[in-house]
Structures are given as C-alpha cells and as structure tokens.
C-alpha cells in the first residue's frame, strides 16, 4: 500500500488565528477563559484547549460576570454581541475574517432594505451568526436555502430587490448549482463577484479531487461536525472513490484497505497535522509504504491577532 497526501490540507489561516487567540488569552490572562461554542470544529483541538483551562459554552447565560469570552471562528449574531456588551463582558473575537466579510455584506443589504438569501446548512453556527447580521426592522428579510429545491419553493417579498451570500465552507460544485438556480428564478438578483466560499475551502476541495483520482481509498481527517471536512468526504465519494471521515487513527478499520494499493489522506481546515501523522504511522504499521506529497496550491495567507493579545503576549 502506498500513501498519498493531499496538498494543501489541514489548518487554514482562520483556524490558526482562532486557536492562537485562545492560547494567547490563556497565557496572558490565565484560566479560565470562556469560549462561546467550539472555537473550531475539531475534537482534538477542543480537548487540548479544555485541558489548559478553556471552558466551552453554547450560550452567554452560561458565562459568569467579569470573565473573558472568546467568540468562535464561526462568528456570532448581532444579538450575541449586544448581549455581551450589555453585560460588560471582555470579548476577544476569533471570527474568521472571511466570515466577517460575509457579515459585512449581509449588514449592508439589511441597511439598504434589500432582501438577502443565504446559501448554507441549517443549524450550522456560521449560518446562525450570518443570519443574525440582518436587521429585519428596515423592512427586508433574510432567507436560507440549501439546494435547488429550496430555491424553487422560496417565496420572497420583492424579487427585484434581492441579493445572495454563501456560507464559507460549502461544496463549490453544489453552491454553483444553487447560484445558477437563484439567477434563473430571480434574474435581477445581486451578489458577490464570486461566491463567498473561502480560499482554503476551495483549495482543499480541488486537492481532494486530485487525490481521489489517484487513490483507491481516501481518508479525511476531521470531526463529524466539521462542515468543510464532510464536504471533502462527499467530493471523494462523488468521484467514485470510497472515503471515510475520521477523527484520528483510532477510527480506522483495517478492512477498509484490503483491496487498496493507494491510500489518500487529506484533512479538514480544523484538523491539526499531528492527527494526519498518527494516521500515517498506523497505516505504516499495517504495511503501507511512503507518504508522497502531491503538488498543490501554496497558501501564504495569515490573519492578524487582536491588538491587546499581540502586545501583551510580548511583555
């Protein structure tokens, strides 16, 4: 068995920044540091931060007064921000800047009284945060669609005053079809020059397509609640390659590889490289050889830290 590694894979700039915000807050202020929602959707990362003093909660009413709170990389609604401000909580915002870009778009549509359609997965925290940027008091509304069927059923107030945005971690292929359906149904709809799917999601999806074309089995390292990791598994399967989403080496079954000569490995944007290395080690223990890195698109993007953490971490 030969191992092939997708490139790029694993952590993106937004995830790096979010994890570093929690780490630096723990270093500068000491535990406990409260984090609203899992800072990124990866069990290994969350458990590591929890062991160092991070406390993960789903709502701010679980947070005591006079503590530090971090908003997760997925972003939060305006209502959550207002609740935190009203309580005087010290907040560090780990929202991915590319998610914030979508928030700004939605807020502008709201101010302009323009109805907005969000393409995304119901119940995902990023979707909840993005929907929560829209203030319907200006007379508009925001709608959520996931697929072409949702578009066909959608009833809007003013089809000539519409715009769309997208969740950042969707399948590019699926989203393109939904956008086409929106433009067909609502010819005057506006939107971003390109969809809002982030560079890292696009790069990892392109890489897994290449990987699936060269391998007999694909392993996607990522947690079950990770949207972008699930999309990677789906893309590999659509290319006719068996694919498995695993948190780590302990989730693998030897029988998956009985007929496999080439095993591909990738990782979602919230999965650390240490988990990939653990998978490689286990496969080698089962007789696999090598670990060839495929050619891929280089990523050199970084996002800045909040100023207070940047400065105080140097003291």
Curated annotation (Swiss-Prot):
Annotated positions binding (2E)-4-hydroxy-3-methylbut-2-enyl diphosphate: 41, 74, 124, 168, 226-228, 270
Domain of life according to the entry: Bacteria
InterPro entries, A to Z: LytB/IspH (IPR003451)
Manner of cofactor binding, per the entry note: Binds 1 [4Fe-4S] cluster per subunit.
The entry's keywords: 4Fe-4S, Iron, Iron-sulfur, Isoprene biosynthesis, Metal-binding, Oxidoreductase
The keyword Nucleotidyltransferase is annotated on this UniProt entry: no
Coiled-coil region list: none
Reactions performed catalytically: isopentenyl diphosphate + 2 oxidized [2Fe-2S]-[ferredoxin] + H2O = (2E)-4-hydroxy-3-methylbut-2-enyl diphosphate + 2 reduced [2Fe-2S]-[ferredoxin] + 2 H(+); dimethylallyl diphosphate + 2 oxidized [2Fe-2S]-[ferredoxin] + H2O = (2E)-4-hydroxy-3-methylbut-2-enyl diphosphate + 2 reduced [2Fe-2S]-[ferredoxin] + 2 H(+)
Annotated residues for binding of [4Fe-4S] cluster: 12, 96, 198
Biological or metabolic pathway of the protein: Isoprenoid biosynthesis; dimethylallyl diphosphate biosynthesis; dimethylallyl diphosphate from (2E)-4-hydroxy-3-methylbutenyl diphosphate: step 1/1; Isoprenoid biosynthesis; isopentenyl diphosphate biosynthesis via DXP pathway; isopentenyl diphosphate from 1-deoxy-D-xylulose 5-phosphate: step 6/6
Biological process, per Gene Ontology: dimethylallyl diphosphate biosynthetic process; isopentenyl diphosphate biosynthetic process, methylerythritol 4-phosphate pathway; terpenoid biosynthetic process
Binding site for isopentenyl diphosphate: 41, 74, 124, 226-228, 270
Enzyme class: oxidoreductase
The protein's required cofactors: [4Fe-4S] cluster
Record: active site: 126
GO MF, one example: 4 iron, 4 sulfur cluster binding
Enzyme Commission no: 1.17.7.4
Binding site for dimethylallyl diphosphate: 41, 74, 124, 226-228, 270
Family per similarity comment: Belongs to the IspH family.
PANTHER family to which the protein is assigned, alphabetical: 4-HYDROXY-3-METHYLBUT-2-ENYL DIPHOSPHATE REDUCTASE
Role played: Catalyzes the conversion of 1-hydroxy-2-methyl-2-(E)-butenyl 4-diphosphate (HMBPP) into a mixture of isopentenyl diphosphate (IPP) and dimethylallyl diphosphate (DMAPP). Acts in the terminal step of the DOXP/MEP pathway for isoprenoid precursor biosynthesis.
NCBIfam families, alphabetized: ispH_lytB, PRK01045.1-2, PRK01045.1-4
Name of the protein this chain belongs to: 4-hydroxy-3-methylbut-2-enyl diphosphate reductase
Protein's organism: Pseudomonas putida (strain W619)
């Amino acid at each position: 068995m030969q191992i092939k590694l997708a490139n790029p894979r694993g952590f993106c700039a937004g995830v790096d920044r979010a994890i570093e915000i929690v780490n630096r807050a723990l270093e500068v202020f000491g535990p406990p540091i409260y984090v609203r929602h899992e800072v990124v959707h990866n069990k290994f990362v969350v458990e590591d931060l929890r062991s160092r003093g991070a406390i993960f909660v789903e709502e701010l009413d679980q947070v005591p007064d006079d503590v530090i709170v971090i908003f997760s990389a997925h972003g939060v609604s305006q209502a959550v921000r207002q609740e935190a401000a009203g309580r005087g909580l010290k907040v560090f915002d780990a929202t991915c800047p590319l998610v914030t870009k979508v928030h700004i778009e939605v807020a502008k549509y709201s101010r302009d009284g323009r109805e907005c359609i969000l393409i995304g997965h119901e119940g995902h925290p990023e979707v909840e945060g993005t929907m929560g940027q829209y203030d319907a008091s200006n007379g508009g509304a925001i709608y959520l669609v996931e697929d072409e069927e949702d578009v066909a059923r959608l009833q809007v107030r003013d089809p000539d005053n519409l715009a769309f945005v997208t969740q950042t971690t969707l399948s590019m292929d699926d989203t393109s079809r939904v956008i086409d359906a929106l433009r067909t149904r609502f010819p005057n709809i506006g939107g971003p020059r390109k969809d809002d799917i982030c560079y890292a999601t696009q790069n990892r999806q392109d890489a897994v397509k290449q990987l699936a074309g060269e391998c007999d089995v694909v392993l996607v390292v990522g947690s079950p609640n990770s949207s972008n990791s699930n999309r990677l598994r789906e893309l590999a399967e659509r290319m006719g390659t068996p694919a498995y989403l695993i948190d780590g080496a302990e989730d693998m079954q030897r029988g998956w590889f009985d007929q496999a000569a080439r095993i591909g490995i990738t990782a979602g944007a919230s999965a650390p490289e240490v988990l990939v290395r653990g998978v490689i080690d286990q496969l080698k223990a089962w007789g696999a050889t090598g670990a060839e890195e495929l050619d891929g698109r280089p990523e050199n993007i970084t996002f800045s830290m909040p100023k207070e953490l940047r400065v105080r971490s140097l003291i």
